């Protein structure tokens, strides 16, 4: 079953047991042959490009084993540090999101890895690799970070200090999934259960999986009761591993699935490890111990929520004749798409007739999603609305964002 990371969750995984046994990456008798049209050149392939995983924990990760947290003091630094991806699509999308929330990241020099947000004067921005954002949250060098949930799961490894503040920033969507060839002995395999039950996998000849996720991969297999499996890491181009005969399957991030299809690979039922997208993550210790950190998170969260809530929403304004506001409200409420956020706002429109101020129209203001926009306009017309104005909504601020209340509860505050 897929690994889910709920809102404000403390990521708690048990570290999979390692095996001391080793096996050859390339068996003398492969279980299937590459498709005839596949030609793979091994020229220039270095030994380090494919290696057996003997340990998935580097020195920088020792503090996250089994959810343990080294005692790292958060005192001695006044600035709140926000980690952002340093390059790629995630980096651009993170900056765009903050800009949409009126948080402008200012770099004196684009080659510098430190920046400021004038709207948050006590906050520094540090541009880092996604995996280093997670590591530095754990070490206390960062307080907040925007990173994919897949990276949080892989490099956080269940550390209790990591807390997810907002799990759905609406970019970086993908999923971590197991993929197998669509030919040879796998041609008729359609599910993880069928893959696990294949008689070919034994202790001497386990299922070989190439992946860059050396924590989530073994954990997923263990959770699903698949015993005869071994993992290897590759420096990119995982899709070529099965055709080269050096892996039976791959475990990698999938967006559209086009790359898998072009390399004669397929996903299988039950093979999704994790659904991922960009998330706002924080250090529990920083939020509870560093002065100003919780207030900064509150402001960032409110801005994010207001912008994301307004995404795809439109304000519709129309004038309608009526005897009084209640009578107009009764007509409006008969239409299913005119309820708004809490209900329609109805206010009098004051007109001057023969030197006197009179009320002949009432203005109706509602908020509707984009998919229901035209239908709402038609329904307003049906009950007497005219002069319909439509404008996009930029922000929707509630009394308090539910995620803030959940965060405080998760922190025990």
Curated annotation (Swiss-Prot):
<dbReference type="InterPro" id="IPR013820">
    <property type="entry name" value="ATP_PRibTrfase_cat"/>
</dbReference>
<comment type="pathway">
    <text>Amino-acid biosynthesis; L-histidine biosynthesis; L-histidine from 5-phospho-alpha-D-ribose 1-diphosphate: step 1/9.</text>
</comment>
<keyword id="KW-0028">Amino-acid biosynthesis</keyword>
<dbReference type="InterPro" id="IPR015867">
    <property type="entry name" value="N-reg_PII/ATP_PRibTrfase_C"/>
</dbReference>
<dbReference type="Pfam" id="PF08029">
    <property type="entry name" value="HisG_C"/>
</dbReference>
<keyword id="KW-0150">Chloroplast</keyword>
<comment type="similarity">
    <text>Belongs to the ATP phosphoribosyltransferase family. Long subfamily.</text>
</comment>
<protein>
    <recommendedName>
        <fullName>ATP phosphoribosyltransferase 2, chloroplastic</fullName>
        <ecNumber>2.4.2.17</ecNumber>
    </recommendedName>
</protein>
<keyword id="KW-0368">Histidine biosynthesis</keyword>
<dbReference type="GO" id="GO:0000287">
    <property type="term" value="F:magnesium ion binding"/>
</dbReference>
<dbReference type="InterPro" id="IPR001348">
    <property type="entry name" value="ATP_PRibTrfase_HisG"/>
</dbReference>
<dbReference type="Pfam" id="PF01634">
    <property type="entry name" value="HisG"/>
</dbReference>
<comment type="function">
    <text>Catalyzes the condensation of ATP and 5-phosphoribose 1-diphosphate to form N'-(5'-phosphoribosyl)-ATP (PR-ATP).</text>
</comment>
<keyword id="KW-0328">Glycosyltransferase</keyword>
<dbReference type="GO" id="GO:0009570">
    <property type="term" value="C:chloroplast stroma"/>
</dbReference>
<dbReference type="InterPro" id="IPR020621">
    <property type="entry name" value="ATP-PRT_HisG_long"/>
</dbReference>
<dbReference type="GO" id="GO:0003879">
    <property type="term" value="F:ATP phosphoribosyltransferase activity"/>
</dbReference>
<dbReference type="GO" id="GO:0000105">
    <property type="term" value="P:L-histidine biosynthetic process"/>
</dbReference>
<feature type="transit peptide" description="Chloroplast">
    <location>
        <begin position="1"/>
        <end position="57"/>
    </location>
</feature>
<keyword id="KW-0934">Plastid</keyword>
<keyword id="KW-0809">Transit peptide</keyword>
<dbReference type="InterPro" id="IPR011322">
    <property type="entry name" value="N-reg_PII-like_a/b"/>
</dbReference>
<dbReference type="InterPro" id="IPR013115">
    <property type="entry name" value="HisG_C"/>
</dbReference>
<dbReference type="GO" id="GO:0009507">
    <property type="term" value="C:chloroplast"/>
</dbReference>
<keyword id="KW-0808">Transferase</keyword>
<dbReference type="InterPro" id="IPR018198">
    <property type="entry name" value="ATP_PRibTrfase_CS"/>
</dbReference>
């Amino acid at each position: 079953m897929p690994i889910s990371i709920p809102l404000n969750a403390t990521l708690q995984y048990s570290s999979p047991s390692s095996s001391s046994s080793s096996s050859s990456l390339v068996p003398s008798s492969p279980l299937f042959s590459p498709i005839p049209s596949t030609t793979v050149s091994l020229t220039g392939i270095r030994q380090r490009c494919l290696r057996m995983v003997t340990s998935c924990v580097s020195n920088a990760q020792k503090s996250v084993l089994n959810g343990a947290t080294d005692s790292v003091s958060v005192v001695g630094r006044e600035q709140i540090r926000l980690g952002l991806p340093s390059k790629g699509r995630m980096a651009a999308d993170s900056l765009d999101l903050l800009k949409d929330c009126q948080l402008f990241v200012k770099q004196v020099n684009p080659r510098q890895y430190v920046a400021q947000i004038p709207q948050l004067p006590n906050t520094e921005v540090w541009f880092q690799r996604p995996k280093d954002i997670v590591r530095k949250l754990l070490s206390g060098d960062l307080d907040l970070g925007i990173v994919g949930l897949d990276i949080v799961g892989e490099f956080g490894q269940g550390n209790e200090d990591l807390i997810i503040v907002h799990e759905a920033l609406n970019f970086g969507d993908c999923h971590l999934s197991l993929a197998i060839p669509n030919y040879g002995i796998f041609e008729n395999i359609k599910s993880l259960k069928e893959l696990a039950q294949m008689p070919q996998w034994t202790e001497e000849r386990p299922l070989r999986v190439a992946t860059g996720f050396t924590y989530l991969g073994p954990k997923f297999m263990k959770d699903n009761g698949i015993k005869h499996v071994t993992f290897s890491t590759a420096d990119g181009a995982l899709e070529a591993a099965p055709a080269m005969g050096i892996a039976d399957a791959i475990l990698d991030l999938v967006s559209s699935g086009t790359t898998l299809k072009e390399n004669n690979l397929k996903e299988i039922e039950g093979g999704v490890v994790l659904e991922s997208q960009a998330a706002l993550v924080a250090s529990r210790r920083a939020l509870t111990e560093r002065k100003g950190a919780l207030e900064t998170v509150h402001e960032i969260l409110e801005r994010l929520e207001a912008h994301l809530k307004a995404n795809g929403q439109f304000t519709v304004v129309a004038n309608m004749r009526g005897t009084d506001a209640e009578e107009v409200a009764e007509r409006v409420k008969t239409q299913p798409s005119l309820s708004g956020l809490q209900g329609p706002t109805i206010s009098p429109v004051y007109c001057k007739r023969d030197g006197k101020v009179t009320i002949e129209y009432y203005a109706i203001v509602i908020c509707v999603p984009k998919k229901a926009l035209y239908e709402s306009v038609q329904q307003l017309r049906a009950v007497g609305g005219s002069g319909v104005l439509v404008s996009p909504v930029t922000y929707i601020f509630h009394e308090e964002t539910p995620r803030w209340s959940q965060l405080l509860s998760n922190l025990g505050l």
